[in-house]
């Protein structure tokens, strides 16, 4: 599995060229993309500027000598590579297993080409077997938890040890155990309209390419262009 993740990450790095501003994703597969960019910066003199999606990735990139900029200092990103926890046949996905979904979505939004790197186990018919992360403000989080419970979403607070995990943006995460999300777009809109929800892990219609590594090799899937 580790080898497949590395292959996917290294393959994605081939899309990066001199002068690009690149979004650096978070998670076990995106890790290898960032490592490969670091190698190219050091060994090939690759000239890029990175925008990171978490404090973990910032630390990794700084250690590799990748120059970084804040999202607030750029207007567009040429290419972002990130992992995904599930991807369906319509190129909708669940992200946020690493608790970085808000920053990941903020970086994805001004990106011209958005690529996910996954191993074949992440490709699914329907989203929902992986718990859907919902980032919520701390104020009123318990009330919101009860709202989700009443709706049958089987919520649980993301924990770190004995305490609730606090994200880089100082929010909580409530994971929803939905089993199957029949209409991810409609459910995304529902969560978008829920007061107290900062962001959710449904990334619908955002990705341009999905690089899938399996024991048979690497496949690059292209999402159909909108319109």
UniProtKB/Swiss-Prot annotation:
One of its GO terms (molecular function) is ribose-5-phosphate isomerase activity. Keywords: Isomerase. Pathway: Carbohydrate degradation; pentose phosphate pathway; D-ribose 5-phosphate from D-ribulose 5-phosphate (non-oxidative stage): step 1/1. CDD domains: RPI_A (cd01398). The active site is at residue 104. It catalyses: aldehydo-D-ribose 5-phosphate = D-ribulose 5-phosphate. Its EC number is 5.3.1.6. Substrate binds at residues 26-29, 82-85, 95-98, 122. It is an enzyme of class 5 (isomerase). It comes from the Bacteria. GO terms for biological process: pentose-phosphate shunt, non-oxidative branch. Pfam families: Rib_5-P_isom_A (PF06026). Catalyzes the reversible conversion of ribose-5-phosphate to ribulose 5-phosphate. Belongs to the ribose 5-phosphate isomerase family. Homodimer. This is Ribose-5-phosphate isomerase A. It comes from Streptococcus pyogenes serotype M6 (strain ATCC BAA-946 / MGAS10394).
